[in-house]
Amino acid sequence: MARLEPEPPAASSMESESEEPEHPLDGLLSKHDELVRKEPQIAANIGEQLKHMDLESLPLTVRRRIRDVAARHKPANVVEVGAGIGHLSAWLFDLWQDEEFRPDRYAMVEAGGKFGIILTRLMRRYEASKWADVVVAEWLDVVANVNAWNAAFATTPDIAALEAPPIPHPIDLCIVDVGWKRQVECVMAAIPLLSNNGLLLTNEPDVPTGDLASLEGDEASSEEAKVAAFNEWITLVKMLNDTHNVGFVPMFGGTLVGIQRKG
């Protein structure tokens, strides 16, 4: 009988070196196999509304994966920045009909007053008024108010306690969907408000593909702005890598990015 020779050590070490180590966020950002994949009917209806209003939303794959991550992470305090008319919110409300996954507090932050009215109707439709809120304000203004509240609480806690902060914090899950123009500043403002195990989710901005040399006028200016914004995004990711785990999940239509403090 022929004897099987052991693999040469050099070959086996080469194989182990070629295998990519698992990223710390791989499990948290992965698909949730126990949840249905079909879009909830209310979310689908909102998607049709968006088409009629000529507005965009996160890709279906990204919305569904955010729902999956929310179910796995089970956050107590959730803040959605740039909630729009509730396309993603409807996915989350649908998940949180099951009290096993429901957070203690959920704040939908939206700058548009008319959108805020639509979000309030959505919240009431899911009978979520006891644990959900609609905050109509610019995100940077909300953050400034939270920081002011924290400063007041540190010096005069009895007085500060009489007025609740505008959003629940520290934030266990923060979802940022504000478009490429303001994405970097809004993500940077949200990071310090995360809890120790807090997770920030956002859709990676599209890589600019236009040929600046062939563009003129407004088209050239718009493409230059996109390039500058994407470069700012790359700089932010590099900076965060020193203190945070930054995970990327490429999917059809977009790439979900997860950011969580190391350790």
Language-model segments: residues:
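Rossmann-like AdoMet
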Residues: 1-64, 68-74
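Hydrophobic, Leu/Ile/Phe/Ala-enriched alpha-helical segments that form helix-helix packing faces
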Residues: 50, 96, 119, 123, ...
